Amino acid sequence: MGLELYLDLMSQPCRAVYIFAKKNGIPFQLRTIELLKGQQYTDSFAQVNPLRKVPALKDGDFVLAESVAILLYLSRKYKAPDHWYPQDLQTRARVDEYLAWQHTALRSCCTRAMWQKMMFPVFLGQPVPPEMLASTLAELDGCLQVLEDKFLRNQAFLTGSHISVADLVAITELMHPVSAGCKIFESRPKLAAWRQRVEAEVGESLFQEAHEVVLKAKDMPPLMDPALKEKLKLSVQCLLH
């Protein structure tokens, strides 16, 4: 059995892995795990990833979890072009720096913005206090400012003049609040221009393909299965803080 990627394109790290593999011509078998249907809780998936999270990679008998680890594994194994994860010590350190920051900063507020603005009220039927959403959106705005001032600065991409895995991870995060109707690029021309450059490097068709599911999420019908609804609510209550 060749390379298998367990993904749900509703998930931002899954989209980053999907885009990277497709863009670099890496052959893989897509194994879709639909998070909103609770497929991550099945015993069969737990045998692949006991953490019950996606993305997950299976390469023969080798199994790997965590999106950053998967991206770097694919980059090394398939000898992706150097710009994705540069050999230059300091440029690579800049990529590592961004990946270390975003996991608890940008990812956290992007995920909470999307769920509080759209998924809780529309999909789970659970209203979110306006003051909570306002606080989350203010935090997101602060993270976007750090993204501009600390990482993008006056460069073409987050770590220099070429696209890297840092840009893939960042753009897929930002499309989460975009899918919920947050106009995060409208008042930030520098970030908007960066987004256009990332899309151009990835390819508009691939970018749209990877984000089709999440951009249609606002049209999903409410979840009706009461048992699954309660299970999902419990798993995402941390996003209401």
From Swiss-Prot:
Pfam families hit by this protein: GST_C, GST_N
Annotated function: Conjugation of reduced glutathione to a wide number of exogenous and endogenous hydrophobic electrophiles. Shows high activity towards 4-nitrobenzyl chloride (4-NBC). Also has lower activity towards 1,2-epoxy-3-(p-nitrophenoxy)propane (EPNP), cumene hydroperoxide, 1-chloro-2,4-dinitrobenzene (CDNB), 7-chloro-4-nitrobenzo-2-oxa-1,3-diazole (NBD-Cl), and ethacrynic acid.
PANTHER family: GLUTATHIONE S-TRANSFERASE THETA-3, PTHR43917
The GST C-terminal domain, residue ranges: 88-222
InterPro entries in UniProt: Glutathione-S-Trfase_C-like (IPR010987), Glutathione-S-Trfase_C_sf (IPR036282), Glutathione_S-Trfase (IPR040079), Glutathione_S-Trfase_N (IPR004045), GST_C (IPR004046), GST_C_Theta (IPR040077), GST_N_Theta (IPR040075), GST_Theta (IPR051369)
Alphabetized UniProt keyword annotations: Cytoplasm, Transferase
Keyword Cytoplasm (UniProt): yes
Record-listed E.C. numbers: 2.5.1.18
A Gene Ontology molecular function term of the record: glutathione transferase activity
Cellular component annotations (GO), alphabetically ordered: cytoplasm
Protein name per the record: Glutathione S-transferase theta-3
Subunit structure: Homodimer.
Record-listed glutathione binding positions: 53-54, 66-67
Reactions catalysed according to its record: RX + glutathione = an S-substituted glutathione + a halide anion + H(+)
Species of origin: Mus musculus
Keyword match Transferase: yes
Principal subcellular localization: cytoplasm
Domain GST N-terminal: 2-82
GO annotation, biological process: glutathione metabolic process
Protein family: Belongs to the GST superfamily. Theta family.
Tissue-specific expression: Expressed strongly in liver, and at lower levels in kidney and testis.
Class of enzymatic activity (EC top level): transferase
UniProt subcellular location: Cytoplasm
